[in-house]
Amino acid sequence: MGTAILLFPTKTYAQDKFTVNGKADFVSDYIWRGADQNSGFSIQPSLTLGYAGFSINVWGSQTLSRWNVEIPSKEFDINLSYSSNNFSVTVSDYWWSGVNRPYGHYKDSHFFEGTLTYCFGKSFPLTLSWSTMFAGADKNEEGKLQGSTYINASYQISLPADITLTPAIGFTPWKGYYHNKAAFTDISLKAGKDIKITDNFSIPLFVQAIVAPIYDRTYLVTGFSLGF
C-alpha cells in the first residue's frame, strides 16, 4: 500500500522490454490513507516485473520496532497494473492481518481493490486517483460488500536544490472502511530529495507531514529507499 520512491541508480528500457525492479523502503512510521497501521519503524520491500505497459508488483511491510504487541504488524500485497501514456489501471489484493496469521482466508482477511490513476503530465503535474474495494473483507455490519472508496489528488512541485514538494489530499465519498460517512481522510505535505553518495549512486530521502481529520491525528514521517 505504500507509495513508490524513485530509486538510484536507474536504467531506462524500451516499453516492450522485460524489466525487473526491487527496492526496500525504510520508514519511521507507516500511515496509510490517514490511518496509523501500528507498525512504527518498518521495512517495506517490493519486487516489480514489467513488460509492454503491464506490471506485477509484490509489496510488503514488516515492523522492526513494535514486537511487544499482541499481533505485530505485517502486510503482503499483490498489484496488477497496466499503464499507457498518463493513465493506469491497477487491481490490488491487500492482506494486513499481521505476523503468524493465516494468509489463505480470502473472504475474511483480504481486501480487493481497483484503482484508476491519471497524471496530467510534466507541464501540469497533477495526479488524480480513484480506488474502490470490490471483493473480500470489505463488508458492513450486515456482511454485504460496501465498496469503500478513496479519492486522492496530489501535485508535484519542483524546487531549487533538486527538492520536490508534493501536497496531497485524500477523501472518502461515502460510508465504508475508512469512516462512517463522507470525509477527508488525509492531508499531507511531502518533501523529497536525492542525497548524492557517489557520482553513480544516490539515496532518496523524504519527510512528510500528515493530518488525518477523520481520526483527529497528526504525523511526521521520514524515510529513505534503496533499490535497483
Q: Which residues are covered by each model-predicted region?
A:
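Transmembrane beta-strand segments that form the barrel wall of outer-membrane beta-barrel proteins
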Residues: 24-30, 54-65, 89-101, 124-136, ...
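Short loop/turn motifs that connect adjacent beta-strands in outer-membrane beta-barrel proteins
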Residues: 13-19, 86, 121-125, 158-166, ...
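Outer membrane beta-barrel transmembrane domains
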Residues: 164-197, 206
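Outer-membrane beta-barrel "beta-signal"
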Residues: 157, 189-191, 195, 216-228
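Cleavable N-terminal export/targeting peptides
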Residues: 1-19
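Short glycine/proline- and aromatic-enriched beta-strand/turn motifs that initiate or cap beta-hairpins
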Residues: 15-65
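Detector for outer-membrane/organellar transmembrane beta-barrel domains
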Residues: 105-175
